Amino acid sequence: MDSSKAPVKLVKVTRVLGRTGSRGGVTQVRVEFMDDQTRSIIRNVKGPVREDDILVLLESEREARRLR
């Protein structure tokens, strides 16, 4: 798979919603798109993350289900 042809999206973490995964290794966050400030989605992030971090999304249409 050649990732140089796939468009990437920059997003900013606006809120950390909580930890998920079997051992809590995944963080659920609300992100806001840098190019469209009105659009925000919920994503799962592996690894350390905090508010105001900038993430690169390879797949921008996918949204995570909310935690219960």
UniProtKB/Swiss-Prot annotation:
GO MF annotation: an example: structural constituent of ribosome
Recorded superkingdom: Eukaryota
Protease recorded as keyword: no
Entry keyword set: Cytoplasm, Ribonucleoprotein, Ribosomal protein
Alphabetical list of Gene3D superfamilies matching this protein: Nucleic acid-binding proteins
GO biological processes: maturation of SSU-rRNA; ribosomal small subunit assembly; translation
Record localization: Cytoplasm
Signal sequence interval, chain numbering: none
CDD domains for the chain: S1_S28E
Primary localization: cytoplasm
Pfam families reported in the protein's UniProt record: Ribosomal_S28e
GO cellular component terms listed in the entry, alphabetical order: cytosolic small ribosomal subunit
Annotated InterPro entries: NA-bd_OB-fold, Ribosomal_eS28, Ribosomal_eS28_CS
Family recorded in the similarity comment: Belongs to the eukaryotic ribosomal protein eS28 family.
Subunit-structure text: Component of the small ribosomal subunit (SSU). Mature N.crassa ribosomes consist of a small (40S) and a large (60S) subunit. The 40S small subunit contains 1 molecule of ribosomal RNA (18S rRNA) and at least 32 different proteins. The large 60S subunit contains 3 rRNA molecules (26S, 5.8S and 5S rRNA) and at least 42 different proteins.
Role of this protein: Component of the ribosome, a large ribonucleoprotein complex responsible for the synthesis of proteins in the cell. The small ribosomal subunit (SSU) binds messenger RNAs (mRNAs) and translates the encoded message by selecting cognate aminoacyl-transfer RNA (tRNA) molecules. The large subunit (LSU) contains the ribosomal catalytic site termed the peptidyl transferase center (PTC), which catalyzes the formation of peptide bonds, thereby polymerizing the amino acids delivered by tRNAs into a polypeptide chain.
Protein name per its UniProtKB record: Small ribosomal subunit protein eS28
Native source organism of the sequence: Neurospora crassa (strain ATCC 24698 / 74-OR23-1A / CBS 708.71 / DSM 1257 / FGSC 987)
Gene coding for it: rps-28
